[in-house]
Amino acid sequence: MNTVLELDGLRREFRRKRGVRLAAVDGVTLSVSPGEAVGLLGPNGAGKSTMIKMLTGILVPTAGRVLVCGLDPVRRRRELARRIGVVFGQRSQLWWDLPLAESFALLRTIHRVPPAEHARRLDECVELLELAPFLATPVRQLSLGQRMRGEVTAALLHSPELLVLDEPTVGLDLISKERLRVFLARANAVDGVTLLLTMHDLPDVERLCRRLVVIDHGRVLVDGSLDELRRRFGGARRLVVDLESPHAALTGLPGVLDVTVEANGLRQQLAFSAEQTSAAQLIAAVVARVAVRDLFVVEPSIEDVVRTLYTG
């Protein structure tokens, strides 16, 4: 299979008062290859959740075409359910009054997973996500972090080709977020599970996804790798230099756009253009001029990239 996900001119309209039709998703075209980890970014109302609902068969497109694992998600929704996993941050696929372990057992039957394969997958998830202490606890009594770890496990027990996660870290504490990030990164790198995530927590996206698709008003603004987006929209890189002794601003260096002097001249931040000079060239020029105690390069943050995209 060349692609796990194929969207071609995808459009979804909703009827508003007085017959006015609003396009929540407006002509989106993109493809996702097996093993990719793709972050879908956009403000509230951008069309992310509507797109997720169409590719999982919950909503029917107004126009365009969508194929997931080579299947039409509306016409072959039951077959597709055995090949993808879905996690909605605000909606559970677990049985509220049953212990977590019993929910997993029911899902094994629903997806017709062989007992040996189910046991292997479950043991792996229990170990990596540290589920053992609350497997016997009814889902309604779990904390949000515990339940979300259970949701991700439930979505992966049938070995899906594609895992779709809609705001999976919303409301989670730092420890729960980290456990989930590490587990998802492993599922992608080791098991080859294709990931499609929507998140508002941009650092989470940065750590999990090598490709970002930014949408607004139902349209794709940009689609590319994080490095590519940084180069195009992130602005200047920064070289932070800690000096052995105070020094006047290090001006006149090649490619340097701006110099910020801190700590009475002991620290200087040099904003530089990657198109005019490399970090290695700038470091060599700095070291040739002053005695350096430490230095490091700061890349434009993903927040900077997204802010530039939305504000122009």
Question: Model features per residue range: what roles?
Answer:
Residues 1-4, 13-27, 77:
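A short, flexible loop at the N-terminus of ABC-type nucleotide-binding domains that lies
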Residues 56:
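Helix-to-loop junction immediately C-terminal to a conserved catalytic motif
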Residues 97, 138-145:
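Conserved ABC ATPase signature
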Residues 105, 109, 116-134:
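Conserved ABC ATPase "signature" region
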Residues 159:
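Conserved catalytic motifs of ABC-family nucleotide-binding domains
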Residues 163-167:
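Catalytic Walker B motif of ABC-type/P-loop ATPase nucleotide-binding domains
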Residues 181-273:
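ABC transporter nucleotide-binding domain
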